[in-house]
């Protein structure tokens, strides 16, 4: 089901599981970089697996185990039971245990072969190299290798039992730290809601603490086989905290004309935000944005005092009011007289005495009916103009 090379990267008891390859990839010493790399690469693998399933119609299942012991899985609908059912989870844990055991056994066999080759090579040393052989045996590196080779058998057995107990404790129904992780929910530009049947991502928390006493493997196996349901921990009850602000102190600033409230310190039940300065609704004062001038003050006073709310004018109108509605006076009559005098001069130039018109009462009355023959004296005509303005200057002497 899984490649042994990938399973060999599974970290055991905090040791480095991946030493790198000849292409330049090496184990990241920084923990933060390791976590970021794991998250990005895992998302990329799940995305490629989903594209493969959608484009080719194949059934895909991906299983990724982090260094903390968290299993991330992705599967198509037909393989969903493999990672979702208790039997599938048990199969995954057994596969991981077997792979880890095989890895330890292979390491132990390699160590035994290397120790046997070392003993054979040491027995075949010539007598001339006896001193060199003694110095190598007494060296610190050779002693450490022998101690490692002697402990490799015990290590393979104990590590396999510990890993098996931790794996089965996570799958057991009494385990309360069972975690589920969806590998494709955090992918950018990936529509997980369009194909809900394609995702079956579950996570198993292998171990959360190294100080927990783990029971025997047989007890955990019996508990797992006897039960078929999982007991999840209850969700914590939601707590509602009511927030009440403190009563601010109201202050009026005469310079700015603003009535505002102070923003004092807030208690635990108060909101983290502050109140903005607000103007009073029943008062209107001059602010800095509207500078006051004598003309504006005059307009403001007139608006408050005038019932019609009509501000007075600071300059006279373009048309004098006396021309609109003013009783007749002597000055107005004189202005009308000057205007009529121009008309009289115009008619006098037309009807000159030398032209024979108006020299006598007959000629004047026949030629110009407006000439008054009764007022003609010594050949000087008097004209009577139409009463245009209804004034007393009807008869004017030339």
UniProtKB/Swiss-Prot annotation:
Domain MADS-box stretches: 20-74
UniProt entry tagged with the keyword Transcription regulation: yes
Feature: compositional bias, Low complexity: 106-121
A molecular function GO annotation: DNA-binding transcription factor activity, RNA polymerase II-specific
One Gene Ontology biological process: positive regulation of transcription by RNA polymerase II
Listed Polar residues bias regions: 262-273, 282-294
Keyword Metal-binding among record annotations: no
InterPro entries: MADS-box/MEF2_TF, SRF-like_MADS-box, TF_MADSbox, TF_MADSbox_sf
Domain of life from the UniProt record: Eukaryota
Example of a GO cellular component annotation carried by this entry: nucleus
Subcellular location: Nucleus
Region listing for Disordered, in residue ranges: 1-30, 101-125, 254-317
Main location (coarse class): nucleus
Keyword line: Activator, DNA-binding, Nucleus, Transcription, Transcription regulation
Coiled-coil parts of chain: none
Cited function: In response to mating-pheromone signaling or nitrogen starvation, it interacts with mat1-Pc. This activates the expression of one of two mating-type-specific genes sxa2 or map3, which leads to inactivation of the P-factor. May also interact with mat1-Mc.
PANTHER family: SERUM RESPONSE FACTOR HOMOLOG
Protein name (database record): Pheromone receptor transcription activator
Organism: Schizosaccharomyces pombe (strain 972 / ATCC 24843)
């Amino acid at each position: 089901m899984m490649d042994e090379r990938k399973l060999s990267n599974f970290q055991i008891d905090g040791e480095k599981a991946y030493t790198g390859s000849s292409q330049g990839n090496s184990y990241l010493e920084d923990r933060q970089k390791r976590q970021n790399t794991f998250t990005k690469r895992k998302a990329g693998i799940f995305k490629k697996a989903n594209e493969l399933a959608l484009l080719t119609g194949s059934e895909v299942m991906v299983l990724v185990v982090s260094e903390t012991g968290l299993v991330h899985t992705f599967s198509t609908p037909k393989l969903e039971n493999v990672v979702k059912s208790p039997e599938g989870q048990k199969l995954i844990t057994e596969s991981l245990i077997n792979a880890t055991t095989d890895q330890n056994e292979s390491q132990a066999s390699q160590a035994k072969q290397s120790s046997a080759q070392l003993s054979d090579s040491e027995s075949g040393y010539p007598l001339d190299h006896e001193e060199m052989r003694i110095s190598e045996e007494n060296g610190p590196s050779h002693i450490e290798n022998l101690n490692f080779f002697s402990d490799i058998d015990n290590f393979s057995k104990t590590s396999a039992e510990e890993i098996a107990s931790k794996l089965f404790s996570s799958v057991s129904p009494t385990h309360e730290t069972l975690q589920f992780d969806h590998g494709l929910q955090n992918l950018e530009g990936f529509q997980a809601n369009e194909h809900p049947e394609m995702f079956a991502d579950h996570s198993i928390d292998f171990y959360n603490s190294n100080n927990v006493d783990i029971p025997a493997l047989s007890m955990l196996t019996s508990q797992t086989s006897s039960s078929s349901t999982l007991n999840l921990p209850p969700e914590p009850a939601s707590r509602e905290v009511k927030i009440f602000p403190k009563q601010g102190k109201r202050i009026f600033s005469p310079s700015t004309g603003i009535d505002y409230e102070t923003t004092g310190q807030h208690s635990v039940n108060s909101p983290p935000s502050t109140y903005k300065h607000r103007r009073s609704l029943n008062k209107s004062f001059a602010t800095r944005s509207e500078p006051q001038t004598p003309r504006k003050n005059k307009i403001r006073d007139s608006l408050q005092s005038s019932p019609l709310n009509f501000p007075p004018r600071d300059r006279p109108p373009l048309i004098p009011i006396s021309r609109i509605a003013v009783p007749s006076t002597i000055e107005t009559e004189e202005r009308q007289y000057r205007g009529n005098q121009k008309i009289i001069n115009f008619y006098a130039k037309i009807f000159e005495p030398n032209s024979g018109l108006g020299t006598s009462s007959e000629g004047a009355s026949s030629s110009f009916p407006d000439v008054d023959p009764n007022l003609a004296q010594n050949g000087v005509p008097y004209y009577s103009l139409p009463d245009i303005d209804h004034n007393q200057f009807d008869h004017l002497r030339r």
